[in-house]
Amino acid sequence: MAATVREAIRELMTQTMATMDALLEASDRELTTASSHACAQGKDLWTLITNDIDHEKIHTGQILEARYESRITASRMQRLLAEWLEERARLIGSLIGLTDEQFNRETAPGEWTYRVVAKHVLTLEQDSLKTIAVDQATRPSHG
C-alpha cells in the first residue's frame, strides 16, 4: 500500500477501475460457479464478491470509528469531497448494465439520453472547477 493517504486513495481508485472492468467482462452465469477463494466459504463467485463488499463495509466502519474515537474530524472540504465521491459512485453505478445502445437512448420520451446526462454532469463539474480556479486566481493573496 502507498505511503501517503493521497497515493493510497489513488491506488484504491485504480483498483476499483480494474475490478469493475474484470467484473463487467464476467457473465451473470459465472456468479454461480464455484470459487476456490477462502472468502467464498466453499461456495460460489457471488458469495466471494458479496463477502468482499461486506468486508469493505466492515473496514470502512473500523476507520470511521477510529477517527471518531481519536477525534480526527474531517474538515468541511474533506467532508464535501467524501460525499461528492459517494455520489459519483452512485452515478457510475446507475450506468452499469446499460448497453451502448441503451446509453444512447432517451431516459424518457423527449428527455436527454443517458450519455447526455453523464456528459452534462461531467461538463458542469469541469466548469465548476474552472470557475474555482479563476476565482482563486483573482482573489487578493493573504500574506
Residue ranges and their predicted role:
Residues M1-G143:
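Aromatic-glycine hotspot motif
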